[in-house]
Amino acid sequence: MKETDIAGILTSTHTIALVGASDKPDRPSYRVMKYLLDQGYHVIPVSPKVAGKTLLGQKGYGTLADVPEKVDMVDVFRNSEAAWGVAQEAIAIGAKTLWMQLGVINEQAAVLARDAGLNVVMDRCPAIEIPRLGLAK
């Protein structure tokens, strides 16, 4: 994927469902969620562990299907094997982008999502890409 494509995704995205969210401040998903919130994104934590709880001021949900609002991007903080199921859920809720974090690599999930019309970013972190592309606020 070209850098201009990634920049376009990041500038057109408003609502991000962060799948695999953790309420532990030392976890990468917590730190990235905080960064994305600080950048002005609306971030929805998704994980059975945060369902019904508030994380960084945002209500948590157990699954993507439980999220009651439109999601632009699904950011995957799960292992590579779990990405296939998350891709299926992202398609089902009508997300525009499936973003698999650093170390999350699943070509089958990427093909599935692309074939369904989603943008796919794999093995990258938005908290790294935003400042690298000069998009930080």
Swiss-Prot record:
Coiled coil: none
Superkingdom of this protein's organism: Bacteria
Gene Ontology, cellular component aspect: cytoplasm; cytosol
Pfam family, one: CoA_binding_2
Alphabetical list of SMART domains matching this protein: CoA_binding
InterPro entries with a match to the protein in the record: CoA-bd, NAD(P)-bd_dom_sf
Cross-referenced PANTHER family: COA-BINDING DOMAIN-CONTAINING PROTEIN (PTHR33303:SF2), CYTOPLASMIC PROTEIN-RELATED (PTHR33303)
Name this protein carries in UniProt: Uncharacterized protein YccU
The organism of origin for this protein: Escherichia coli (strain K12)
